[in-house]
Amino acid sequence: MADRNLRDLLAPWVPDAPSRALREMTLDSRVAAAGDLFVAVVGHQADGRRYIPQAIAQGVAAIIAEAKDEATDGEIREMHGVPVIYLSQLNERLSALAGRFYHEPSDNLRLVGVTGTNGKTTTTQLLAQWSQLLGEPSAVMGTVGNGLLGKVIPTENTTGSAVDVQHELAGLVDQGATFCAMEVSSHGLVQHRVAALKFAASVFTNLSRDHLDYHGDMEHYEAAKWLLYSAHHCGQAIINADDEVGRRWLAKLPDAVAVSMEDHINPNCHGRWLKATDVNYHDSGATIRFSSSWGDGEIESRLMGAFNVSNLLLALATLLALGYPLADLLKTAARLQPVCGRMEVFTAPGKPTVVVDYAHTPDALEKALQAARLHCAGKLWCVFGCGGDRDKGKRPLMGAIAEEFADVAVVTDDNPRTEEPRAIINDILAGMLDAGYAKVMEGRAEAVTCAVMQAKENDVVLVAGKGHEDYQIVGNQRLDYSDRVTVARLLGVIA
């Protein structure tokens, strides 16, 4: 299918499709151009079939459209000389269509999918860094962005559309990548965005409350994550045995690799396993000793906190399962770098230690505070807020966690979006036994400044919620703002 021809593309589904040379594939009629294939899907908010006339006017070569309520599956029509092929369940088929269009890029690199509530970004970054240290040109796709390491381009969503994902992977293959670690969101799984990818390995980090505004309850959220293993080509399964959901899944996945730092592994019951035997936390990170099916070892990590030890062990187990030699992984482990905006430490002489993290769920905030406490000789401060137009139920939970685990809580704005900022703050305060305990300051930059300037030299200030983000959404505006830049300026260092 080197020439990207419509007939070849549709051969598995519509053998009598007409021959048309195709330039690009797009779901967006606004960018459709001469020679393109426009795919008209029915989405949650819009019916792409309404934009077929616009796409034709812009010179597309062909159209594939959802058949439901319009035509029979495989029906071929013509509009103004442009073939329109109707397929039923087009959203479900889209990943496979895009895979054929872009020459099945997941066949041409080692693709590792990482799913879970927290830890996806750090785990994918560690996987890509480690494989690159072992000589593989490596890439990442996810929350921070997509691209070869060192050339990552920011993106809007953790997992793009089915077409975007295949297009991005094809681009990475063209740039020489032989390894890619991809964050796989629950939305992406439910919406079939990675349905046709061939993962070499699939990693589960953990499951805790998030996205219930979309999934409704934890049962549906868990079911969405399980799709990676039940309905996809998942390859090697790497599962966090310290998570209750992970332990349930391990019972259903006898060939999976079990990973633990809390002694949730019985080597006699698990075929392949990796577990921490001793972890020593210190100012510059942690010393981790482990045992595994592949042998024992010790790693010096520059990452903060227990959950990052878990992320590192998951990455290590994944690479071992893929055949990377343990000796080579141990030799290169000390060169793994902390991830931008993920428990990222900023220090300066005479100033408090400031940690910037993406924690924006109750579980992540608790773990971030526990991690920061391990490195804190004085008071532990926590600056945080909650996003507007999102799950309101987590707000009081996060307030309670800040009150329990921080010495000083500063409650501020996150991305208020179209909600009233003070109303969000009040929801957070409702979870505290003593609402007067918290300092309240709506302006985020002002709140961060207040905490950093008032904290003492041996204090630690955790600035949670935005991590790597360089914007704040207020109303419908996307304003320039970065916790990292704000903190660096206050400490007189470079972000």
Curated annotation (Swiss-Prot):
Annotated positions of the N6-carboxylysine modification: K225
Top class in the EC scheme: ligase
Domain of life of the organism encoding this protein: Bacteria
Meso-diaminopimelate recognition motif, short sequence motif: residues: 414-417
UniProt keywords, alphabetically: ATP-binding, Cell cycle, Cell division, Cell shape, Cell wall biogenesis/degradation, Cytoplasm, Ligase, Magnesium, Nucleotide-binding, Peptidoglycan synthesis
Catalytic activity annotation: UDP-N-acetyl-alpha-D-muramoyl-L-alanyl-D-glutamate + meso-2,6-diaminopimelate + ATP = UDP-N-acetyl-alpha-D-muramoyl-L-alanyl-gamma-D-glutamyl-meso-2,6-diaminopimelate + ADP + phosphate + H(+)
Subcellular localization: Cytoplasm
GO molecular function annotation: ATP binding; magnesium ion binding; UDP-N-acetylmuramoylalanyl-D-glutamate-2,6-diaminopimelate ligase activity
Major localization listed first in the record, in broad terms: cytoplasm
Cofactor(s) needed by this chain: Mg(2+)
Disulphide bonds in the chain: none
GO biological process: cell division; cell wall organization; peptidoglycan biosynthetic process; regulation of cell shape
Binding site for UDP-N-acetyl-alpha-D-muramoyl-L-alanyl-D-glutamate: L27, S29, H44, Q45, A46, N157, T158, T159, S185, Q191, R193
Membrane-spanning parts: none
This protein's record includes keyword Nucleotide-binding: yes
GO cellular component terms attached to this protein's record: cytoplasm
Binding site for meso-2,6-diaminopimelate: R390, D414, N415, P416, R417, G465, E469
Residues that, per the record, bind ATP: G116, T117, N118, G119, K120, T121, T122
Record pathway: Cell wall biogenesis; peptidoglycan biosynthesis
EC numbers: 6.3.2.13
PANTHER family given in the database record: MUR LIGASE FAMILY MEMBER, UDP-N-ACETYLMURAMOYL-L-ALANYL-D-GLUTAMATE--2,6-DIAMINOPIMELATE LIGASE MURE HOMOLOG, CHLOROPLASTIC
Family: Belongs to the MurCDEF family. MurE subfamily.
Function: Catalyzes the addition of meso-diaminopimelic acid to the nucleotide precursor UDP-N-acetylmuramoyl-L-alanyl-D-glutamate (UMAG) in the biosynthesis of bacterial cell-wall peptidoglycan.
Protein name as catalogued: UDP-N-acetylmuramoyl-L-alanyl-D-glutamate--2,6-diaminopimelate ligase
Native species: Escherichia coli O6:H1 (strain CFT073 / ATCC 700928 / UPEC)
Originating gene: murE
